[in-house]
């Protein structure tokens, strides 16, 4: 902050927060990462409820790559066709919600490992759509001089702030729920 106040840093410009797209992009990333923290429930369910070992749990994570590929293709094709951002964002959050509903109604009742991969693929598809769109949305009307600042904001919110808040919320919820059983 000292370097930014004295204007010795060309990388972090606090004027970037005056742009609505950057503020909305940071808020969307924060919301996305808080929602994405619910993925730890998949690992808890797989480890505790289904008694999977670490290798099976890690191989379940490999199915994320399929979801990321599907999400990237959907985002590029529909974005290239000029579909409005609000519909693409709604589609991404729909996939995240669909994954949670699938986990609740399909996987939880049956407890079959093979069905768990579909929930992982659906969630990864929604996450990839939202990752791509949030970055593209903030870059839409942003002057080039704020690009490095936007990248710094995006990485800070995505890697530090969002997962910390989401992890704290879901850990407290999980701990509170365990006290009743």
Q: Which role does the model predict for each range below?
A:
Residues 61-181:
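C-terminal module of multi-pass small-molecule transporters
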Residues 1-57:
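Membrane-helix boundary/linker segments in multi-pass transporters
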């Amino acid at each position: 902050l000292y370097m930014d106040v004295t204007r010795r840093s060309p990388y972090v410009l606090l004027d970037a927060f005056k742009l609505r797209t950057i503020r909305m992009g940071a808020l969307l990333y924060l919301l996305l990462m808080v929602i994405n923290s619910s993925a730890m429930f998949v690992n808890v369910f797989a480890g505790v409820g289904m008694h999977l070992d670490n290798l099976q749990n890690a191989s379940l994570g490999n199915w994320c790559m399929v979801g990321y590929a599907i999400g990237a293709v959907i985002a590029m094709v529909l974005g290239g066709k000029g579909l409005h951002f609000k519909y693409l964002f709604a589609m991404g959050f729909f996939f995240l919600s669909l994954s949670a509903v699938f986990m609740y109604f399909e996987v939880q009742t049956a407890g079959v490992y093979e069905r768990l991969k579909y929930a992982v693929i659906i969630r990864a598809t929604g996450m990839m759509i939202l990752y791509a769109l949030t970055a593209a949305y903030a870059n839409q009307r942003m002057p080039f001089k704020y690009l490095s600042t936007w990248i710094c904001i995006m990485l800070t919110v995505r890697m530090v702030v969002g997962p910390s808040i989401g992890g704290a919320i879901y850990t407290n919820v999980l701990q509170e729920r365990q006290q009743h059983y």
